[in-house]
Amino acid sequence: MKIDGRPYRTIFPEAGGNAVTVIDQTRLPFAFELKRLASLDDAAVAIRTMVVRGAPLIGVTAAYGLALAMREDASEAGIERAAATLAATRPTAINLRWALDRMAAVLRRAPEAERAALAFTEAASIAEEDVASCRAIGEHGARILAEIAVKKGGPVNVLTHCNAGWLATVDWGTALAPIYVAHDAGVPVHVFVDETRPRNQGAALTAFELNAHGVPHTVIADNAGGHLMQHGQVDVCIVGSDRTTAAGDVCNKIGTYLKALAASDNRIPFYAALPFSTIDWTLADGVRDIPIEERDAREVTHLTGRTDDGAFATVAVVSPGSPVANPAFDVTPARLVTGLITERGVCAATEEGLAGLYPERRKAA
């Protein structure tokens, strides 16, 4: 996507494979800064501290992190150590494990002397595949928005939660890709952007993206979505996913489940947009089996923003001494999901629906 007319991806390698550059998302929306990752530790810290975030981008960053590690130690033990370090950074997003498993499998088949170069080639392939998948998700999802616009005879009001745009992937995004494709095709679209506490990824990141692309949008408080649905102001909900089970349960940013409940109660379609790499084919019951990351209490107790004089400040917003819980994700049961928008098309959030799009998985099972 473009920032001030210049095309950017969220991650890109330096010539020669000595490092990769990422957009530092902890500085957005008030400062657009690039950060250089030159080692395994740099990549792991970037993932853990959410300099990069979003399931697909986490996976690609991990792939490049493993490639950086191969410059120092390309042995079997080196592969194992690097993969373990990266896997420990964020437990919920399945793309992380998927990318590491793919990288390790490719590297183990190659002679040790060839692994460093091969690792960067494979990481770049994963990045390119992510871009293609997200673009395809956008095409499939845009058809849904176009149909709603024709039926309604006016702008489509989309509600989204957290950030599942190009900042969460290499480019285009998942949940926002249909919005970008539809907008670029002339379909009138307006987006309600949940602020998405505690890290405000909707207000900070999704609004930043939509502003940059010229998409009409309104930032709302997290608890406003149900009210808007009750009063007919939302036509469709589209969210991303950090892990989707083989049965169609969708794990996404905390608060997604509540939006799905409100959408169901008001008969509003609720879609999750995700690439193949987000599907965990080993799990059937997402509520029971998906590990939910518990993050630092300071994300809840403190807020960081820009003051009127342009300085950045962090302030406390919770009564001192109050205990805090900070689960980062929740799981929306498949029964509340109208459909899954993938790079291969749209399907029901069921085992049969996913198997119809990915028949090779059924054969593998």
From Swiss-Prot:
**EC main group:** isomerase
Biological process terms in GO annotation: L-methionine salvage from methylthioadenosine
| Catalysis: reaction(s) | 5-(methylsulfanyl)-alpha-D-ribose 1-phosphate = 5-(methylsulfanyl)-D-ribulose 1-phosphate
Q: Name its pathway.
A: Amino-acid biosynthesis; L-methionine biosynthesis via salvage pathway; L-methionine from S-methyl-5-thio-alpha-D-ribose 1-phosphate: step 1/6
| EC identifiers of the protein | 5.3.1.23
Feature type site, description Transition state stabilizer: 162
Keyword list (alphabetical) reads:
Amino-acid biosynthesis, Isomerase, Methionine biosynthesis
Residues annotated as binding substrate: 53-55, 90, 201, 252-253
The record, for Gene3D superfamilies, names:
translation initiation factor eif-2b, domain 1, Translation initiation factor eif-2b, domain 2
Q: Write down the InterPro entries for this protein, in alphabetical order.
A: IF-2B-related, IF-M1Pi, IF_2B-like_C, Initiation_fac_2B_a/b/d, M1Pi_N, NagB/RpiA_transferase-like
Annotated Gene Ontology MF terms? Answer: S-methyl-5-thioribose-1-phosphate isomerase activity
Instruction: Provide the active-site residues from the annotation.
Output: 242 (proton donor)
Which family is it part of?
Belongs to the eIF-2B alpha/beta/delta subunits family. MtnA subfamily.
Name the PANTHER family on file. Answer: METHYLTHIORIBOSE-1-PHOSPHATE ISOMERASE
Q: Which NCBIfam families match?
A: eIF-2B_rel (TIGR00524), PRK05720.1 (NF004326), salvage_mtnA (TIGR00512)
Read off the HAMAP family from this record.
Salvage_MtnA
Q: What does this protein do?
A: Catalyzes the interconversion of methylthioribose-1-phosphate (MTR-1-P) into methylthioribulose-1-phosphate (MTRu-1-P).
Q: What is this protein called?
A: Methylthioribose-1-phosphate isomerase
- Name its species: Methylorubrum populi (strain ATCC BAA-705 / NCIMB 13946 / BJ001)
The opening ranks of the lineage are: Bacteria, Pseudomonadati, Pseudomonadota, Alphaproteobacteria, Hyphomicrobiales
